[in-house]
Amino acid sequence: MGPICRLTPILVAVVFLATPSPCGAASCELPRSLRGIPLPARSLSASDACLVDSVVRDPATASTVGPAHTPLERPLFEFLLDHPEAGAELARALAVDDIVFRREGPDRFWADDKDGSAGTLRLLSKSETERLYYFDCRHEEPFYWPVRVRVVLLMSSESLPPSAGGGQNSTLAVYTRIEDPVIRTLIAVFGRVARRVVSRKAAKGMKLSSRLGAALSRRPIDALRALPAMPLGAVERKELETHLTRLLP
């Protein structure tokens, strides 16, 4: 989540940044869904539920992006979701994007979109069809001081039957909350513009997934050649090799 930022540089910062804030467990009452996507509240720890609650209770923006389609079959699709550092390496190898992911621990990654936003992405919960993320990062603009916001992303995905073209469809619910009072006031005034910027930035990430899936389907040999550089263990590298080999004609 450019030229469009020059008109409203303040609003661009809304999309990615995040920092945790304290929240009492007693106040964490989560809704059953976000933008129509079921929220896996019961699978969250008390502290993670507080993080989600403090964003979605009174967000600066709330938007839905998608559905976006990728031609990948489910096993490879889920592998790349579980190992975004491998997906980022493949995106660079296939000249799709230069985004960076670095694993910091279980379900925790350092992410840098190379567009002013960098920070920690956490996977809070996952099921067969939903994944809940919390993004904590810092965004820098040449026209404005660094800004922090807190972002909750809830993704829903489904496999399409061969009769519908196969592959996966994904929909993303994005909630942001700004901690800077000046920015928060401006967002309240320019809410429609802010929602449009957030949607555009989130759509960029969804399009990256679609473009990477298309590139892998077209160029599996080039993807296999990139395997030695993958920041993966031997077992994960072998698993990815198996998935990519299945893409060969």
Regions found by a protein language model. Give the residues of each.
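N-terminal secretory signal peptides that target proteins for export/translocation
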Residues: M1-C5
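Bacterial N-terminal signal peptides
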Residues: T8-T19
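Hydrophobic ligand-binding cavity/cleft-lining segments
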Residues: C23-G105
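Terminal "cap-and-tail" regions of soluble proteins that handle hydrophobic small molecules
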Residues: A26-L44, L154-P249
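Envelope-exposed proteins and targeting segments
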Residues: T61-G66, E73-L76, T129-R131, V151, ...
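Solvent-exposed loop/turn segments at secondary-structure junctions
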Residues: A86-G87, R138-P142, R177-P181
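Short solvent-exposed beta->alpha transition segments
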Residues: G87-W110, A229-L244
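Glycine-rich portal/gate segments that line the openings of hydrophobic small-molecule binding cavities
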Residues: V100-V152
